[in-house]
Amino acid sequence: MRIKGVVLSYRRSKENQHTNVMIIKPLNVNSREEASKLIGRLVIWKSPSGKLLKGKIVRVHGTKGAVRARFEKGLPGQALGDYVEII
């Protein structure tokens, strides 16, 4: 089952930004319980040039269904607001 998701932000604090960990909101997932079923799944972002950057969902973020995904390499800023595919 493939799910689309939106890249919301980098994982960050007031002074630090972790560019290889992204906060992703899967579409039609609205609770922490539904999001926890996605842990361990593969996340793929396709760049405008056609490269595929792969990551893995590592944990839930918050109570509204967002998740954290750790990528092999950091995603560029142009990925923010873009769609990813959760496999």
Swiss-Prot record:
Cited Pfam families: Ribosomal_L35Ae (PF01247)
NCBIfam families named among the record's database cross-references: PRK04337.1 (NF003326)
Gene that this polypeptide is encoded by: rpl35ae
Domain of life from the UniProt record: Archaea
Entry GO terms, CC: ribonucleoprotein complex; ribosome
BP-aspect Gene Ontology terms: translation
Keywords, in A-Z order: Ribonucleoprotein, Ribosomal protein
PROSITE patterns associated with the record: RIBOSOMAL_L35AE (PS01105)
Entry protein name: Large ribosomal subunit protein eL33
Similarity comment: family membership: Belongs to the eukaryotic ribosomal protein eL33 family.
One function term, GO molecular function aspect: structural constituent of ribosome
